[in-house]
Amino acid sequence: MKSALHQIGKTSLAAALSGAVLLSAQTTHAAALSVSQQPLMLIQGVAPNMLVTLDDSGSMAYAYAPDSLVNSRNNVYFASNSYNPMYFDPNTQYKLPKKVTLSNGQIQVQDYSKPSFTAAWRNGFTQEGRVNLSRDYRPTVQYQGGSGAGTESSIDWYGAPAFYYQYSGGRGCSLTTSSCYTRVEISGAAQQQNFANWYSFYRTRALATQTAANLAFYSLPENARISWQLLNSSSCLIGSGSSNCYNNYLRDFTGQHRVNFFNWLENLSVGGGTPLRQAMTRAGEFLKKTGVNGPYAYRPGTQTSPEYSCRGSYHILMTDGLWNNDSASVGNADSTSRSLPDGKSYSSQTPYRDAASNTLADQAFHYWATDARPDIDDNIKPYIPYPDQANPSAEYWNPRNDPATWQHMVTYTLGLGLTTSLTSPKWEGSTYSGGYDEIAAGRLSWPNASNNHSNNVYDLWHAAVNSRGEFFSADSPDQLVAAFQDILNRISGKDLPASRPAISSSLQEDDTGDKLTRFAYQTSFASDKNWAGDLTRYSLTTQDKATVQTKLWSAQSILDAMPNGGAGRKIMMAGSGTSGLKEFTWGSLSADQQRQLNRDPDRNDVADTKGQDRVAFLRGDRSKENSDNFRTRNSILGDIINSSPATVGKAQYLTYLAQPIEPSGNYSTFAEAQKTRAPRVYVGANDGMLHGFDTDGNETFAFIPSAVFEKLHKLTARGYQGGAHQFYVDGSPVVADAFFGGAWHTVLIGSLRAGGKGLFALDVTDPANIKLLWEIGVDQEPDLGYSFPKPTVARLHNGKWAVVTGNGYSSLNDKAALLIIDLETGAITRKLEVTGRTGVPNGLSSPRLADNNSDGVADYAYAGDLQGNLWRFDLIAGKVNQDDPFSRANDGPAVASSFRVSFGGQPLYSAVDSAGAAQAITAAPSLVRHPTRKGYIVIFGTGKYFENADARADTSRAQTLYGIWDQQTKGEAAGSTPRLTRGNLQQQTLDLQADSTFASTARTIRIASQNPVNWLNNDGSTKQSGWYLDFMVNGTLKGEMLIEDMIAIGQVVLLQTITPNDDPCADGASNWTYGLDPYTGGRTSFTVFDLARQGVVDSKSDYSYNKQNVAVSGTEQKGLGGLTLSTNEQGNPEVCSSGECLTVNPGPNTRGRQNWRPIEGKN
């Protein structure tokens, strides 16, 4: 072959390239929900500074990597991805970039036009210079764009149909043996389009970098702060704001600034040397800048103060070459003793030191070890993913950790086409693998770097280590995309501090003789331990009038000690046969399921052949951990965040109350049989499974829902940490007894929350023979969103048992609907869709069902939506006998057609704050009988805590607890809504927050008002229709909200609120547990909580307020996940939040629970 240089006409690299791999070609909706894949309580409110440096040197025009391949340009293997990784790879899907613009203040996104195979653009961004790839293709050696004519160096003067060479390998073959390659012409519409995409957007280093950076940065949140620069352009320096660099001031990554960044990427032109050290200097010195355009300004460009001292700063440095033609002046920083800003002393040590001065590594160490802003506090969060409590010094100097609390710069370096040069120390795919151990142990030294020296390739690796960042080496376009995304995930991970344990808990009671022995199952997770989780069993006893927990076992420890790499685990998935299940093994997977697992999550889901190893990894095999394709786990058991355990032992219901529901079912016989059932505890985890454990902590069963299968492979990624976290089976399992198929069964309903859009039902009657009843996903119900709502199992008037649930959030059409699902078959019995505001995302939340006449059959359902509407649904016949409106005499399948949205399709109430803004409802309402015995008081709270933006406390408005009187609950035709507003309700307030001591127990408490509600006028007409309580103390807004289910017991309603931290430099959230009068929403007339921790509730737990002792309305408690109702050893009710239980008084003359279900947790 011959090489040719020819003119291709006027061309530049201008275009509009933008895109995220997962987005469709449709214009994005500005109001679309952003469901977080990270636990919000760990997210800080301060976004990091991100400084991006891209290489614009002349070698970025090359269509090969590494540089040495130019000498092989006339050989056939130059046109093979096996030899030249920049060349077309038939196994890689080359995704089109997207164009980002701003229209009417909203970001708009659309796909770039597909390049045609018969008229493909040489530069896909400028859409200039076309080539007919079906006949005129010539492999590119170098492509140089610019404002004038573009030039291209290519192989052979004579065009041909597009092709690649396939390496056959085999005996006697090497990558440079021409006879071992077979020429393959591009054929078929799909492959031709893929080749055209590669040719127009990926075939050179520059084009691949533009596309890869765009695909990675597209998903960066809008609150990130970003500036950018090139190596060679004097008018494109970090933070300069130059118009020639698209106004690259440091700004929030939103609006026009976001568009500017993508425009800068799209207009990248190349030419010049590789002055990496000058670029590093500009980035490091920029962090020292003060003022309104500085890196610590509150709103850069607008407002300087307050300057948050916890804001991290990261430098992303991408290059394809070795630094040259520049200088630095930091000396041999990594070999010079010095005092660090936190008082620690550094002396020359591995793996930081070397013998050379003024290297990139020296600069990286200097800008890590120097306090960029000594005038502000040192509050950067330490990042310690590898703790070493036995040796704090080793922990501090482990470069995988970043203990620096001062303002400093962490650098991530990315080399393109350099891997084959990294031989001593040897690069093996990640910063701390390969030859790194030799460096750390002192058996090898970092090669000395100097101007334009071949050793400078190691300086990129060394620099990343010295700054507590990471080095990435990519050789192909798909690796480049993955590397950029990995870097952003690592930064997000460092921005996510370690978690606290015991996020949720569930209590199990167990009767043994005349003594009540109590057990608690607590879940926990640790983001700083590679997203490990645990389920722990405790016994609960009372000592000195306080509840004491004694740890019995840890499911994590038992599972991790399991022999044979998980081979013996019973992990099931949907299958055929009588059980509806099959083993999760490689051989049992369908071809499509194998394809899904044959994807490399570290390389942008490129196809590979590691699927069988991924199955083994997910089953618990740890033999391949910490290799090129598999991460290291601290535990096989994944993080358990929002899923509360459910226990299954004896029958679920009280026999004498359940028997009349299905007279032919003989529940007493069923209940007697279940007395000997082996107890189990079920819980969902974000390792892709619902787990079942016995009472000794042994895993006996696991189930992988089909709705999470598509992203199972992500769990194996080396980059699965921090911001790469995904939710999987994150919902709380719901267990109930139900009658179908002529028999009673115990069923488990599973949901996923942010893990996916799906529901499933398992028959767990026999724990040794569990059956899958059904699964539902978007294919079966398009309006199913993320399954945040908690399902309810109920007998309905159509004569069938059903699962009743809200449709969830972020569904296809963003609608809200109540789903009624046949429990036995999974068929949708009815979908009751509600109205809402157009253009505003909606979704129905968890429902609460009402059984008006206590016959065990649901008559009404209540649920709220994201637009703040409280809905009622009539689950009764259209026409009823008013003398006996809920009679079961007319029950039958036809009744289902009469199920409807009450009040003519209008809400019972629409929640808005004092300014008229809608208040989202995401927790299930609670119901109490109205004191007049007419209807219900429907109690519900407002607040939303699942989008990324919800992590920061919203102190601009109040969320509210409401009690609304629904008077029309006797089966009458409720054809019109009461149309209530706040003006129809009695206001209550939180009047006091104080620190106090109750019999030596220190607490922070709150006192609510006690305003009476005047329900009726003298003539019996309605005067007030309820009450409301804004969550603020003396008018002070903290962002408090209600997102967990409440508990109504006796004459008190118990609830727990959450308040995201209003300090942007702190993670976490605070919680308040309230006990309020359900009839007024205010302070109770009796003492509710045993704040003195004496096992009973009396006046010792009162508080002196306005010269009298009053009941405390709320107390601050630790732990998230809502409240669990139980009983203590004295038989008194208590409410538990994670580790603390408080005895509660439900009020005087309180009757027993009027419900045919037993006390929660009773077996």
Swiss-Prot record:
The keyword Transcription does not apply. Coiled coil: none annotated. Changing residue 600 to K: Preserves integrin binding. Residues 619-621 are annotated as: Integrin-binding motif RGD. Ca(2+) 1 binds at residues 600, 602, 604, 608. Transmembrane segments: none annotated. Residues 329-352, 1138-1163 are annotated as: Disordered. It is found in: Fimbrium; Membrane; Cytoplasm, Cytosol. GO terms for molecular function: calcium ion binding. Ca(2+) 2 binds at residues 851, 853, 855, 857, 859. InterPro entries: PilY1_beta_prop_dom, Quinoprotein_ADH-like_sf. Interacts (via C-terminal 532-1163) with host integrins alpha-V/beta-3 (ITGAV/ITGB3) and alpha-V/beta-5 (ITGAV/ITGB5). Involved in pilus assembly, twitching motility and adhesion to host cells. Primes type IV pili (T4P) assembly and is required for inclusion of minor pilins PilV, PilW and PilX to the surface pili. Stabilizes assembled pilus fibers likely by antagonizing retraction mediated by PilT. Calcium-binding and calcium release by PilY1 seem to be essential for twitching motility and for regulation of pilus retraction dynamics of PilT. Adhesin for human tissue specifically recognizing a host receptor localized or enriched on basolateral epithelial cell surfaces. Belongs to the PilY1 family. This is Type IV pilus biogenesis factor PilY1. The gene is pilY1.
